[in-house]
């Protein structure tokens, strides 16, 4: 399957060994969450459609991925699933859910979006538009510190 706005492929090296780069995976998860969600197949190389036939995913790897993505992102929801391909090789199908109410970001403050087959940083005007398009939290209905307005300082109410 070709990479597009809903699908991406990552090498298993992205999440294992000395070459693991969870930061890049986190950026892709943020980009998918800010778009309409998507799927990242981890363990399938860019030039392949199947994993290596001998590839086996360890039982702890999906949990490790969830833990690291949760540490590196805000407002990103993911669900990993280990899939056995036709050739017997295994890979992880990482479902990234769309962030419908809030804006997803990395813990470094990067806001990204999926654009065709790539993830890119949002420009300020795009971020403003994305924020205004999302239904926001209704702060007016939030009770702050459980203090009723009748206990407010009357002098401050009249100024």
Where are these regions (language model features)?
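Conserved N-terminal catalytic/coupling substructures associated with nucleotide/phosphate chemistry
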Residues: 1-159
